[in-house]
């Protein structure tokens, strides 16, 4: 029921991946 939290988690994962690549 927390779609915002879900999206935030996805963004966090994406950011972590980008940081890893960088």
UniProtKB/Swiss-Prot annotation:
Transmembrane segments: none annotated. It is found in: Secreted. Contains 8 disulfide bonds. Keywords: Disulfide bond, Secreted, Toxin. Residues 1-15 have a biased composition (Basic and acidic residues). Expressed by the venom gland. This is Cysteine-rich venom protein collettin-a. It comes from Pseudechis colletti (Collett's snake).
């Amino acid at each position: 029921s927390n779609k915002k939290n879900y999206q935030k988690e996805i963004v966090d994962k994406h950011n972590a991946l980008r940081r890893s690549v960088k």
